[in-house]
Structures are given as C-alpha cells and as structure tokens.
Amino acid sequence: MSGYARPLPRVTPDNLPFWEAARRHELRLQRCGGCGRFWHPPGPVCPDCLSERCDWTPVSGRGTVSSFVVFHKAYFPAFADAIPYAVVQVELEEGPRLTANLVEVPPAEIRIGMPVSVVFDDVTPEISIPRFRRAP
C-alpha cells in the first residue's frame, strides 16, 4: 500500500492511455485523425469536427502559465501539509490547456506567461501525476 494520502485520479476507458503514458513519464494527448486538433480532457470524439478517429500522440510538455491560484487554506485535510500550494492552468505549445500543480516555484514568483515544463510525480506504483515546474 502506498503512503500517498491524497485523492488519486479516476482512471476510465477514455483516459486510460493518458495515465498509462504518464506512468512511463510521457505526456500524450488525443489528436484528431480528421482535423489534426489536439484536445484535453480525453473524450470519445474530436470536439471540433466530431471525428471518432484519434491517436494518443506525444506532446512536448512545454507551455506557459495561463492562470493560477495559490491555496493558503487546506479545504481537505489531505492537503494540509502542502499549504501553500499552487494550481496552474498551462497552455501547452500544442494548444490544449492542462490544470496541474506547479512545483519548485515559490508562490510569490508565479506569473501569467511563465514558461513551464512537465515533470511526473510517482505517487503509487500505478499512478504518476503530471505536474509542472519553471522551464529551464
């Protein structure tokens, strides 16, 4: 049993390839075989052209912070030891936006437009959670 006490992501048939790739420390998103659009969160059809043809394609993991919040209060007991912690929305170079924790950056230094890159947190043997840190 893992010592990780925070909620784990719910793995579904639609998002299973995302979590399998994350476990290998790869960031993969769905890409439409019809129009070429990347999208996230995962789903059964392209949100632009409604094509059911999609592939799970590796993406760069690089992007910029488009929005953020810093939590100074633990709304759930499992997060009390992390206060303060940042949650960012990152616009990836490929277009989609992902919401994740920002790590290794003091809250006062977080800025909209800050370049970031993905890192993976191996929270259990089965689950690696994508997070972001300041890009080198």
Predicted feature locations:
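A broadly conserved sequence feature marking short terminus-proximal activation segments
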Residues: 1-27, 134
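Residues immediately within or flanking Cys/His clusters that coordinate Zn2+
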Residues: 26-29, 43
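Short, cysteine/histidine-rich loop/knuckle motifs that typically chelate Zn2+
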Residues: 31-34, 45-51
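Short coil-to-beta-strand transition motifs
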Residues: 55-64, 110-114
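Short, basic/aromatic beta-hairpin or loop at an interaction surface
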Residues: 82-98
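Well-ordered alpha/beta subsegment
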Residues: 95, 99-136
